[in-house]
Amino acid sequence: MRRRVASNLLWMLADRGLQVVVGIGVVAMLARALGTEGFAHFQYAQSLVFIAASIPLICSAEVVVPRLVARPAPEAAHALLAHAYAIRMTAGIAGYAMMCAYLAFTQQPADTWIPAAILGTAIMLREPFGVVIAWMQARTHNRPNVVFNLVAMAAKVALIGALFFTGVNLVPAYATAFAIEPLIAAALLAWYYLSRAPRTVPSRDASLTRDLVRDGTLFWVSFMLMVCARRADQLILKPLVPLAELGAYAATMQVLDNFTTIATILAAGIAPMYVFGQKSAEAARRNVLRVAGGMTAIGLCGALILALSAEWVVALLYGQAFGETVVLLRLAALASTLVFADVGLSLLPVFLRKPRWVAMKWALVLTTTVIVDLIAVPRLGTRGAVLGYAVGNAVALILGLVLALRARTATAIASA
């Protein structure tokens, strides 16, 4: 079992590692081609898409993967995935429509709404077709997804490189290149699963749909709150700081997003066997604490390296125009260690089927982040947003530890 988990993790980490390495070149070209203001418009559009993309998460992997592990029969898994896909696609279309409505209502400039409309097509692709990734995770076999990601990423990089070296500096052109990636990945995922799935078309099961929506709703609310907590800073910053400073802050968060995704990959690779596969809550709790401890150590080591090499990273990625990003990255990198610990601890409420707790946690994190940002940003500018990022992550970690302690107490009482 350990060898299988280790092999799966290596493939997932290799996938993310290659994405980060290639992302260095992509970000370097993007920042240099668009400049600080154009880069700020692009990142703001991505933030809007990121928030809207949380809507299809109403039937997330946290709901689908444990069910797939519990019912591995091909016909049962096929029916489950078909219903999850229908739910996600419906939500994805709604999410894209809501994003477009927001752009129209707020009368965003063309530099924002055009790239947002293009990038937003991913809302209807990533999560709906991502049910195949959940199927792979349940089988602890992520290698095909890694290959598909590489193919899609190669196409995106080729297009961006062509735009950059031909001197194109239009934000919509680069947004189109980014939108190609999820389209190719979705097509490959659909081909891979359908070539191996049962040939029968699952009949519509209203009770299964209700169960998936009901069980996924609180996790979905928590994801929505989490996404808002992660992107509220940029929405608050835009009217309060110059566009160039917003670009510097967005550059910092982009580096950290790439870095902290490693935590999600580690958790996704370990959870099916070491957490979701446990028979007792106490065994799962112990494993979650071990996972969280190991992930914290990895996060701390990575954060220290990132902070020490911040000047070199910024110069390589963004160039001299993003000098303010160096200080922001050093401060935020150290705070990102808390993200690794929180992601590990978040496996426990998923195992215990306590989405209400997750939703409450992220509601408090969002509230804390917004309050700190509204107080600190007018006084400290982008550094105030970094403070909000750190305090919000600390609140998430504390609440995760509280749940782990409560779970231990409840287990002790039940066994007494």
What spans do the regions from the language model cover?
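Membrane-water interface segments that mark the loop-to-transmembrane alpha-helix transition
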Residues: 7-23, 45, 49-50, 54-103, ...
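Membrane-interface junctions at transmembrane-helix termini in multi-pass inner-membrane proteins
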Residues: 125-149, 334-361
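Signature of the first transmembrane helix
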Residues: 3-61, 214-243, 369-370, 389, ...
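Hydrophobic alpha-helical transmembrane segments
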Residues: 113-120, 146-197, 364-368, 382-406
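Interfacial segments at transmembrane-helix termini and the short loops linking adjacent helices
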Residues: 36-40, 103-119, 243, 307-340, ...
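Transmembrane helix-bundle signature of multi-pass secondary active exporters and lipid flippases
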Residues: 42, 46-54, 226, 249-268, ...
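Helix-loop junctions and terminal segments of transmembrane helices
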Residues: 23, 56-73, 138, 256-281, ...
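Interhelical loop/hinge segments that connect adjacent transmembrane helices in multipass membrane
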Residues: 1-5, 143, 171-177, 187-230, ...
